[in-house]
Curated annotation (Swiss-Prot):
Pfam families: Seryl_tRNA_N, tRNA-synt_2b. GO terms for molecular function: ATP binding; serine-tRNA ligase activity. One of its GO terms (cellular component) is cytoplasm. Consists of two distinct domains, a catalytic core and a N-terminal extension that is involved in tRNA binding. It is an enzyme of class 6 (ligase). L-serine binds at T232, A233, E234, E286, S385. CDD domains: SerRS_core (cd00770). It comes from Sulfurihydrogenibium sp. (strain YO3AOP1). Catalyzes the attachment of serine to tRNA(Ser). Is also able to aminoacylate tRNA(Sec) with serine, to form the misacylated tRNA L-seryl-tRNA(Sec), which will be further converted into selenocysteinyl-tRNA(Sec). This is Serine--tRNA ligase.
Length: 417
């Protein structure tokens, strides 16, 4: 959630930054400022009327004791009560409109984020490794998986519908091995605390990280219950400290968790229909950092390096891309994508997205810390995939494939199988 104080004091700055995402936000900001002004006037009027009512209520017993007529005061007190009630009803309507706009406004892009409309305007930062040159026509992961009988898309569809898969034998074991490998690297080498969290959360938890209300259509809701399946462990890990005030000496906090993730993939019709690249249910190891504001951008660079480490150990080529303003997620101030090389597509595909949300999520989730002087400040939160497990499986199957249609296991994983 953007800082209302910043919006009031420097609306041009807010509009300038949001314009780099989409010009349509400018009208929303103008309307938000209008409502805010109206809201503050009503609040001031209510406070003034309450003060008057309190003064007249104090006079009432004095006049009564003196035997004076109190009819006029009684009528005025009653009138004030009715006026306040009407103003409070009006204020509630205005508050609802204010929040309905505020909750849909994304984070302000950081100044060094490239300005652009979509993924075509993203900026490549670096590459690691060289794509393998095959002396045969490389197969796709789903061709390899079907031929080996380890990926079964028909049975996945029979059980659950489209974009679901059943894994057998080597695929199932490799999925499990990758999860354990990723968690071990992040906990033993990068200092993260491993966490196990629920996969079902309350709506206010999804509000805290920015999925609700804007992305309601991409979430799975439990019928007749006010619970949602998580689209990422970012939701649960970040909200571990919702409505809390942390001590400065307890920061930074690094959390990692493996969870299944659930997404309707609204708007993805026709994209990546074959294979396991885009599923309604998928496994992911998530990384979340809760840090002091002055540390957050250094922590973002570290976060990207920590996610990269997994691919380096697996010896799979990838590149790091800085997302432009038009391609960034709703809550992000700055995002790097890590894209892994997929031989069958002859291109890089996203396997991790690492973001600094600054205090955007912290404001929504009310996560603060107390400094040495006793003052409270919002933390900065960061999140990233470390990594998407299914996409890592794809990358291994394709980059390590052999002419006979099988594939090798990366050296670093052999102790996990």
């Amino acid at each position: 959630m953007i800082d209302i104080k910043l919006l009031r004091e420097n609306p041009d700055f807010v509009k300038e930054r949001l314009k780099t995402r989409d010009e349509s936000y400018l009208k929303l900001i103008d309307r938000l400022l209008e409502i805010d002004e109206e809201r503050r006037k009503i609040i001031k009027e209510i406070e003034s009327l309450r003060a008057e009512r309190n003064e007249k209520s104090k006079l009432f017993p004095i006049l009564k004791k003196e035997g004076k007529d109190t009819t006029e005061i009684q009528q005025r007190v009653k009138q004030i009560g009715e006026i306040i009630k009407n103003l409070e009803d009006k204020l509630q309507e205005i508050e609802n409109e204010f929040n309905n706009i505020l909750y849909y406004i994304p984070n302000l892009p950081a100044p060094d984020v490239p300005i652009g409309k979509d993924e075509n305007d993203n900026v490549e930062i670096r590459r690691w490794g060289k794509p393998r040159k095959f002396d045969f026509e490389p197969l796709s992961h789903y061709e390899i998986g079907e031929r080996l009988g380890i990926l079964d898309f028909e049975r996945g569809a029979k059980l659950s519908g489209s974009r679901f898969t059943v894994m057998f034998k080597e695929a199932a074991r490799l999925e499990r091995a990758l999860i354990n490998f990723m968690l071990d690297v992040h906990t033993k080498q990068h200092g993260y605390t491993e966490v196990w969290t629920p996969a079902l959360v309350k709506p206010e938890i999804l509000f805290g990280t920015g999925q609700l209300p804007k992305f309601k259509d991409d979430l799975y809701k439990i019928e007749d219950e006010d619970l949602y399946l998580i689209p990422t462990a970012e939701v649960t890990l970040t909200n571990l400290h919702a409505d809390e005030i942390l001590n400065e000496e307890d920061l930074p906090k690094y959390y990692t968790a493996y969870t299944p993730c659930f997404r309707k993939e609204a708007g993805s019709h026709g994209k990546d229909v074959k294979g396991i690249l885009r599923q309604h249910q998928f496994d992911k190891v998530e990384l979340v950092k809760i840090v002091k504001p002055e540390d957050s951008y250094n922590e973002l660079e570290k976060l990207v390096n920590e996610a990269e480490k997994i691919l380096q150990l697996l010896e799979i080529p990838y590149r790091v891309v800085l997302l432009c303003t038009g391609d960034m997620g709703f809550s992000a101030a700055k995002t790097y994508d890590i894209e892994v090389w997929i031989p069958s597509q002859n291109r890089y595909r996203e396997i991790s997205s690492c973001s600094n949300t600054e205090d955007f999520q912290a404001r929504r989730a009310k996560i603060r810390y107390k400094d040495k002087d006793g003052k409270n400040h919002y933390v900065h939160t960061l999140n990233g995939s470390g990594l998407a497990v299914g996409r890592t499986l794809i990358a291994i199957m394709e980059n390590y494939q052999k002419p006979d249609g099988t594939f090798e296991i990366p050296k670093v994983l052999k102790d996990y199988l």
